[in-house]
Regions:
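Active-site-adjacent structural elements in enzyme catalytic cores
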Residues: 1-185
Length: 185
């Protein structure tokens, strides 16, 4: 669909509509990120699509693991083997900018950018953490959880992006998240 992956039954309904007869709703997705796809057809397992389970986690169980060169290749002629690796495959409808750095600089910068965009008539979304939420002043502000909890951040990511799509958000500013357990996902 080109949209962020479904994390709730209603997302599946939006994406697939009348193409399926039934949806079994087991609640929200536990992780909220794409699944890791690993190719076991070669001697050394190869990650075809990074997801929650990163290379280091897999190597603890499998030994040596390669990463498909197409995943990180800057050359557009080197294609990844797995689905879901195209440039905008899981992108939200809105333009997304991630602001990295020290939080005492990131927060005022996001507030400034969001205010500029709102002044220009754009609907703005902000992705932050529980720790910084109260410091944001402009836009549809959504917390992704506690900064130290990789799993919570992973769980909420696609759901927040889809919420912004549903709300008609045109520009998203997000804090950067240091989430080593999420790997390249």
């Amino acid at each position: 669909s080109g949209r962020p992956s479904p994390t709730k039954a209603e997302h599946v309904i939006e994406d697939l509509g009348d193409k399926i007869d039934c949806i079994i709703d087991g609640g929200d997705a536990e992780i909220g990120l794409e699944s890791t796809i690993v190719d076991f057809t070669e001697e050394i397992p190869t990650i075809l699509r990074p997801g929650y389970y990163n290379k280091e986690m897999l190597e603890k169980v499998l030994g040596t693991v390669r990463v498909d060169p197409g995943i990180l290749a800057e050359d557009s002629h080197v294609r990844p083997k797995a689905p879901g690796m195209r440039y905008k495959h899981y992108a939200p409808k809105a333009d997304l900018t991630i602001i990295q750095g020290e939080m005492e600089r990131v927060i005022p910068e996001i507030n400034r950018l969001a205010a500029e965009q709102e002044k220009a008539g754009k609907k703005v979304g902000v992705i932050c953490t529980d720790e910084t939420r109260e410091q944001y002043t402009t836009g549809d502000i959504k917390s992704i959880g506690l900064r130290a909890e990789d799993e919570t951040i992973a769980h909420h990511l696609f759901a927040i992006l889809r919420d912004f799509d549903e709300d008609g958000v045109e520009v998203i500013y997000s804090e950067a998240f240091d989430t080593p357990r999420m790997g390249q996902a």
